[in-house]
């Protein structure tokens, strides 16, 4: 007998998509994905329609209601539900994930697709089912393109807030000599390690904040987190090294820029995608 599933959808503006996805995942949802072509955009996931469903939905609503206290706006709290058969959902959500080209040669693809690759293309395989970062979010794409431009052979790289590990995997495939990926969520560390194995790249994934100095550091996290850890990020980057900072909504660009530049960084460039921003800095040699 096939299992029945509850399809749960929550309205989420782009800036809240990752947080809502994480809330669904923590509630136990499988197959979490964002439908950003809808108006308003929605995040959808699937829970078993069993005797634990009501308690899980209650917990999910509580989690969604607390998001504004963390500075996350644009997340709905109302849940839209419908019941689906296992055969329907198991493949339906996968239709939203196709190979995507980012930058000049990076191709992000789910494991069930076989993308067309051209000379010098670099495939990055990421399973979107865990909702830890699939490459579809503008900030991830900004960081991937920046990595492609600033990576040089054998650089030592740190990825702060790695999520799925997509940026760390890209750095490794672009020629980094050593990559350390950190996340304070142990499940993210596990998923990043699994994704690295699928991509057959070495990756040191850990919960602990890295120590030592790095040629390039990428931090695709919230603006407030970048601001709060600006001093720690500065300690990681070697003199003349590069910091790529994103996860920044355009209204917070000035705040992030001030915090980072106050720690001895000079701006190199600013990249935009809609309302999202990636900032690239070089650490002073003085």
Name every feature range the model reports, one short phrase each.
Residues 3-10, 14-118:
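N-terminal auxiliary segments of SAM/dcSAM-dependent transferases
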Residues 124-125, 158:
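Conserved beta-strand elements of the Class I
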Residues 130-213:
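Conserved SAM/SAH cofactor-binding pocket of Class I
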Residues 146, 150, 235-239, 263:
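Conserved helix-to-beta-strand junction in the class I
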Residues 187-191, 225, 252:
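Conserved short alpha-helix immediately C-terminal to the canonical SAM/SAH-binding motif I
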Residues 216-218:
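Hydrophobic beta-strand segment of the Class I
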Residues 227-242:
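A short glycine-rich, Lys/Arg-flanked "PGG" loop and its adjoining helix->strand segment in the class I
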Residues 249-286:
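Active-site capping/gating segments
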């Amino acid at each position: 007998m096939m299992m029945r599933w509850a399809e749960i959808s929550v309205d989420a503006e782009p800036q809240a998509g990752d947080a809502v996805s994480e809330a669904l995942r923590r509630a136990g949802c499988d197959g979490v994905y964002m439908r950003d072509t809808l108006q308003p955009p929605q995040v959808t996931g699937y829970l078993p329609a069993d005797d634990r469903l009501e308690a899980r939905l209650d917990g999910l609503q509580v989690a969604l209601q607390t998001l504004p206290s963390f500075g996350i706006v644009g997340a709905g709290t109302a849940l839209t539900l419908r019941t689906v058969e296992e055969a329907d959902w198991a493949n339906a959500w996968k239709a939203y994930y196709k190979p995507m080209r980012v930058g000049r040669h990076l191709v992000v693809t789910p494991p069930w697709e076989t993308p067309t690759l051209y000379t010098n293309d670099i495939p990055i395989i990421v399973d979107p089912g865990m909702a830890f970062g699939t490459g579809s979010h503008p900030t991830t794409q900004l960081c991937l393109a920046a990595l492609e431009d600033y990576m040089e052979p054998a650089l030592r790289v740190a990825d702060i807030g790695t999520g799925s590990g997509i940026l760390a995997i890209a750095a490794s495939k672009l020629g980094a000599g050593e990559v350390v990926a950190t996340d304070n969520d142990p499940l993210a560390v596990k998923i990043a390690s699994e994704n690295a194995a699928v991509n057959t790249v070495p990756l040191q994934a850990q919960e602990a904040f890295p120590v030592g100095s790095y040629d390039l550091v990428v931090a695709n996290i919230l603006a407030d987190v970048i601001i709060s850890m600006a001093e720690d990020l500065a300690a990681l980057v070697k003199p003349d090294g590069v910091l790529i900072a994103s996860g920044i909504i355009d209204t917070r660009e000035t705040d992030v820029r001030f915090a980072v530049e106050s720690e001895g960084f000079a701006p190199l460039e600013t990249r935009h995608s809609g309302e999202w921003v990636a900032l690239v800095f070089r650490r002073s040699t003085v």
